[in-house]
Design a protein with these regions (language model features):
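Short amphipathic alpha-helix that is part of the acyltransferase structural core
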Residues: 8-11, 194-216
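A short alpha-helical cap/connector motif
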Residues: 1-108, 113-134, 138-195
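Conserved GNAT acetyl-CoA-binding A-motif
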Residues: 271-284
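Conserved short alpha-helix immediately C-terminal to the canonical SAM/SAH-binding motif I
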Residues: 70-74, 263, 287-288
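Conserved active-site alpha-helix within GNAT-family acetyltransferase domains
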Residues: 284-302
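Conserved beta-strand in the GNAT
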Residues: 223, 229-237, 244-247
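Conserved acetyl-CoA binding element of GNAT-fold acetyltransferases
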Residues: 241-253, 303
Length: 309
């Protein structure tokens, strides 16, 4: 039995989570097809994935982070036994505290699932211009799609957090994300070349009768600006157990999908903080956009878009 097979067997015997075969093959194919040379891994476990990545080419360099001291120590030994200590640098630290300035062609997130969004937001700044971020375990053994498979409260809470992360990926206008049915579910996110960082400004003065009424009803009104150009005005408010978003004005019709995603990302945190899991969007008929599934939205017969968090 070779070194990598022994590592895999050790992980199985000791219930140490490692990437499933199909998921690992997908990531390795991505590394080869995209010519990735520098890889950052969040969650080393015992070094199984990092070793597989480094074995793809002598030109591949891997930096990997593991918080658990026992797994870190085992990974150090495994990397050394495979003769890869010069190309795999492992750090024993909480990834959220790690200070890394390098840029990477591929970032692989496979650590604490409850922290996925924080990992994504922190390390997206370490992504090269044409790099990709891959996240594993988005199906969580089928329980994300079918939560009735478990009655454990802690597991149910984790499933909700994974669902929120998937929602975050689908809505995030800064990245184009595809989720693949590989292994336990993996996402691949690439920078969106059309993305412009938006600004949000509260509308405090009624510019017209419609906005005046929205303010009178107690709705929060915001404008979205991209490069100092207003692209839309929207209101949002809570109604029973869901949020309602109403687009008042849309200036950049050619960017309607990104404008909607920007707005959803802005409102999403308020919804989650309020314990809201459903957002209803009212969009004028003439502005209905094509990227419904990509933005995680469902269209209903009454002309409303639904987004589940």
């Amino acid at each position: 039995m070779n070194e990598i097979s022994e590592i895999k067997e050790y992980a199985k015997r000791n219930s140490i989570p490692i990437v499933l075969d199909k998921g690992g093959e997908f990531i390795c194919d991505t590394i080869v097809n995209r010519g990735c040379k520098k890889i950052l891994e969040i969650g080393s476990a015992i070094g199984y994935s990092a070793i597989n990545f480094a074995n793809l080419s002598p030109d591949i360099y891997v930096r990997t982070i593991e918080i658990d001291i026992d797994r870190y120590s085992r990974a150090v030994d495994n990397i050394k036994n495979c003769g890869l200590q010069d190309r795999i640098k492992i750090i024993n630290e909480d990834a959220l505290d790690a200070k890394i300035d390098e840029k990477f062609d591929l970032i692989f997130i496979d650590a604490a699932k409850a922290q996925y969004e924080k990992f994504f937001e922190k390390f997206k700044h370490n992504l090269s211009e044409k790099g990709v971020i891959i996240t594993d375990n988005l199906f969580f053994h089928g329980m994300v799609e079918n939560p009735s498979l478990t009655h454990n409260y802690s597991t149910i809470k984790l499933i909700r957090k994974i669902r929120k992360f998937v929602s975050f990926l689908q809505l995030n206008p800064e990245f184009n994300t595809t989720i693949y049915d590989k292994g336990d579910g993996v996402s691949l996110s690439m920078l969106n070349p059309d993305f412009i960082q938006p600004e949000y400004k509260a509308v405090t003065e009624a510019r017209n009768e419609t906005i005046a009424k929205e303010i009178e009803y107690g709705h929060k009104i915001f404008s979205i600006f991209e490069n100092e150009t207003e692209t839309g005005v929207f209101s949002f408010y809570r109604k029973e157990d869901f949020f309602v978003i109403n687009f008042i004005e849309i200036s950049a019709t050619e960017r309607i999908e990104i404008t909607v995603r920007n707005m959803l990302m802005f409102v999403r945190k308020d919804a989650i903080d309020s314990g809201i899991h459903l957002i209803k969007i009212k969009l004028p008929e003439e502005y209905r956009f094509n990227g419904i599934k990509e933005a995680g939205l469902t269209y209903t017969e009454d002309g409303t878009y639904i987004h589940k968090l």
